[in-house]
From Swiss-Prot:
NCBIfam families: SP. This is Solute carrier family 2, facilitated glucose transporter member 3. Pfam families: Sugar_tr. GO terms for biological process: cerebral cortex development; D-glucose import; D-glucose import across plasma membrane; D-glucose transmembrane transport; dehydroascorbic acid transport; galactose transmembrane transport; monosaccharide transmembrane transport; negative regulation of apoptotic process. InterPro entries: Glc_transpt_3 (IPR002945), GLUT (IPR045263), MFS_dom (IPR020846), MFS_sugar_transport-like (IPR005828), MFS_trans_sf (IPR036259), Sugar/inositol_transpt (IPR003663), Sugar_transporter_CS (IPR005829). It comes from Rattus norvegicus. It comes from the Eukaryota. GO terms for cellular component: acrosomal membrane; caveola; cell projection; cytoplasm; glutamatergic synapse; membrane; perikaryon; plasma membrane. Residues 277-279 are annotated as: Important for selectivity against fructose. It is found in: Cell membrane; Perikaryon; Cell projection. Facilitative glucose transporter. Can also mediate the uptake of various other monosaccharides across the cell membrane. Mediates the uptake of glucose, 2-deoxyglucose, galactose, mannose, xylose and fucose, and probably also dehydroascorbate. Does not mediate fructose transport. Required for mesendoderm differentiation. Keywords: Cell membrane, Cell projection, Glycoprotein, Membrane, Phosphoprotein, Sugar transport, Transmembrane, Transmembrane helix, Transport. The gene is Slc2a3. It catalyses: D-glucose(out) = D-glucose(in); D-galactose(in) = D-galactose(out). It is a multi-pass membrane protein.
Length: 493
C-alpha cells in the first residue's frame, strides 16, 4: 500500500463534511446570547394572545422549552442515523438533511414576524433533529474517507467545526451585531446559509469508498475514489481489507440497534462508546458554557460576555492543538490527560468560588481554572468520543453504534441542561465537585477499558473485540494497547 498523502480532494471532502459539525456548534450556542430579548418576545406575543400579562412561571417554562427542545430533537435525529446512511449513503444523507436545516432555519427566522411562539419552538426542534443526524453522519464519513495514519487528526476536525460554530454564535450574538431586539431572528435563521453552502459543495465530494465497496459492491469506483483522496495508486491493502469485511457482512444480516445490545461481540465496544460520550457531557463542559456568563459575573468580571467569548477562543485553539497531538500521543492517552486535568480544575473552581469574597485573588484563580478546564476538555474529552466510535466498529454495526452513542450524548446533554441550574442553586460552588467525581470515574474507566486505536485498521480493532468476546475476557483494551501500531513506511499507510 502506497504512502497516503494529505490531498486537496481529501481536505475538501472533510472540510465540507465539517460544515455539519459547525451547524451543531452554532445552534448549540446561538440561543444563549439573546435570552433576555427572546423572553421579551415570548412575553409580548403571549400578552397579545391572552390579552393579559402571562405568568412568570409560563414564561420560564416556554423559555426552558425553547432551549431543551433542541436536545430532544438531537435525540430523535441521532437515533435515526442508520435509517439514512444505510439507504442513501454517507454523503447523500448529509445532502438530504440540509432540507431539514433550511426548514428549521426558516421557522425560527420568521417566528417574530408571524408573532408565533410555536414556530420558534418547532424550529428549534427541527434544527435539533438535523444536528442529531449530523453528529452521526460527519464522524462516520470522515473516519471512512481518511487514511488509517491520519484518521485521528481528521476526526478532530469534527470537534473543531463544533467549537468554531459555538464561537461564531457567541460573537454574532453580541448586541451590536445580531443580538439586538430587531435582528435576533436573523441570528437564529442564519443557520440556513451553511446549509445552502454545504448543499452546493457536497455533489463535488465523493461517497464513502467503504460504503460503495462493502454496501454497494462497487469495487472499481471505491478504488478510484481512494486513489484520488489519498494521492497514491496503490490502495490494494485497503481494498482487500474492505473486501474481507464485505464477505463477513454477507454472512450475517444487517445489525440493528437491538441486535447491537444482544450480541456479546459488540458489548465491550458499545459500553466504551457510550461511557466516552457520557464522559464528554458529565465532565460539566456544557454546564460551564451554558452558565459561564453568570460564573464570570460571580467571579467579579466587569464584562462577562467577553470573558465567555475568550473561553470560546481557548476552546478553538486547543482543539487545533489536539489535532496535531492525537496521532502522536494517541486517543487513550489524550483522553486520560484531559479528564485528569479537568478534575483538578473543577476542584480549583470550587475552592476559588467559595473564597472569592474573602480573597480578591481568588476571582483570578477562578477565571484561570475555567480557561485551563476548557483547554483540557479540547485535548481529549471534546474530540475523541465522537470519532473513536467509528473506529471501534466494523461497517455492519457502525451506523447502529453511532446512533446509540449519539443518542446517549444528546440525552446526557439534556439531563445536564435540565438539572444543573437546580443543583447549582442547592449546592452552590460545590456543584463542580460532582463533576470532579464523574471525571475521576471516567479516568479510571478509560485506564482499564479503553483501547488505543492509533494506527490500527478497522479490522485489527474489530478482531481484538471479537477475540475478547469469544474468550469471555475483558482484555481487548490490553490486547490492542500491547500491539505495535501500523507505521508510515514507503510500503504502507
Amino acid at each position: 500500500m502506497g504512502t497516503a498523502k494529505v490531498t486537496p480532494s481529501l481536505v475538501f471532502a472533510v472540510t465540507v463534511a465539517t460544515i455539519g459539525s459547525f451547524q451543531f456548534g452554532y445552534n448549540t450556542g446561538v440561543i444563549n446570547a439573546p435570552e433576555t430579548i427572546i423572553k421579551d418576545f415570548l412575553n409580548y406575543t403571549l400578552e397579545e394572545r391572552l390579552e393579559d400579562l402571562p405568568r412568570e412561571g409560563l414564561l420560564t417554562t416556554l423559555w426552558s422549552l425553547c432551549v431543551a427542545i433542541f436536545s430532544v430533537g438531537g435525540m430523535i435525529g441521532s437515533f435515526s442515523v442508520g435509517l439514512f446512511v444505510n439507504r442513501f449513503g454517507r454523503r447523500n444523507s448529509m445532502l438530504l438533511v440540509n432540507l431539514i436545516a433550511i426548514l428549521g432555519g426558516c421557522l425560527m427566522g420568521f417566528a417574530k414576524i408571524a408573532e408565533s411562539v410555536e414556530m420558534l419552538i418547532l424550529g428549534r426542534l427541527i434544527i435539533g433533529i438535523f444536528c442529531g443526524l449530523c453528529t452521526g453522519f460527519v464522524p462516520m464519513y470522515i473516519g471512512e474517507v481518511s487514511p488509517t495514519a491520519l484518521r485521528g487528526a481528521f476526526g478532530t476536525l469534527n470537534q473543531l467545526g463544533i467549537v468554531v460554530g459555538i464561537l461564531v454564535a457567541q460573537v454574532f450574538g453580541l448586541d451590536f451585531i445580531l443580538g439586538s431586539e430587531e435582528l435576533w431572528p436573523g441570528l437564529l435563521g442564519l443557520t440556513i446559509i451553511p446549509a445552502i453552502l454545504q448543499s452546493a459543495a457536497l455533489p463535488f465530494c465523493p461517497e464513502s469508498p467503504r460504503f460503495l465497496l462493502i454496501n454497494r459492491k462497487e469495487e472499481d469506483q471505491a478504488t478510484e475514489i481512494l486513489q484520488r483522496l489519498w494521492g497514491t495508486p496503490d490502495v490494494i491493502q485497503e481494498i482487500q481489507e474492505m473486501k474481507d469485511e464485505s464477505i463477513r457482512m454477507s454472512q450475517e444480516k444487517q445489525v440493528t440497534v437491538l441486535e447491537l445490545f444482544k450480541s456479546p461481540s459488540y458489548f465491550q465496544p458499545l459500553l466504551i462508546s457510550v461511557v466516552l460520550q457520557l464522559s464528554q457531557q458529565f465532565s460539566g463542559i456544557n454546564a460551564v458554557f451554558y452558565y459561564s456568563t453568570g460564573i464570570f459575573q460571580d467571579a467579579g468580571v466587569q464584562e462577562p460576555i467577553y470573558a465567555t467569548i475568550g473561553a470560546g477562543v481557548v476552546n478553538t485553539i486547543f482543539t487545533v492543538v489536539s489535532l496535531f497531538l492525537v496521532e502522536r500521543a494517541g486517543r487513550r492517552t489524550l483522553h486520560m490527560i484531559g479528564l485528569g486535568g479537568m478534575a483538578v480544575c473543577s476542584v480549583f473552581m470550587t475552592i476559588s468560588l467559595l473564597l472569592k469574597d474573602e480573597y480578591e485573588a481568588m476571582s483570578f484563580v477562578c477565571i484561570v481554572a475555567i480557561l485551563v478546564y476548557v483547554a483540557f476538555f479540547e485535548i481529549g474529552p471534546g474530540p475523541i468520543p465522537w470519532f473513536i466510535v467509528a473506529e471501534l466498529f466494523s461497517q455492519g454495526p457502525r451506523p447502529a453504534a453511532m446512533a446509540v452513542a449519539g443518542c446517549s450524548n444528546w440525552t446526557s446533554n439534556f439531563l445536564v441542561g435540565m438539572f444543573f441550574p437546580s443543583a447549582a442553586a442547592y449546592l452552590g460552588a460545590y456543584v463542580f465537585i460532582i463533576f470532579a467525581a464523574f471525571l475521576v470515574f471516567f479516568l479510571i474507566f478509560t485506564s482499564f477499558k479503553v483501547p488505543e486505536t492509533k494506527g490500527r485498521t478497522f479490522e485489527d480493532i474489530t478482531r481484538a473485540f471479537e477475540g475478547q468476546a469469544h474468550s469471555g475476557k475483558g482484555s481487548a483494551g490490553v490486547e490492542l494497547n500491547s500491539m505495535q501500531p501500523v507505521k508510515e513506511t514507503p510500503g504502507n499507510a
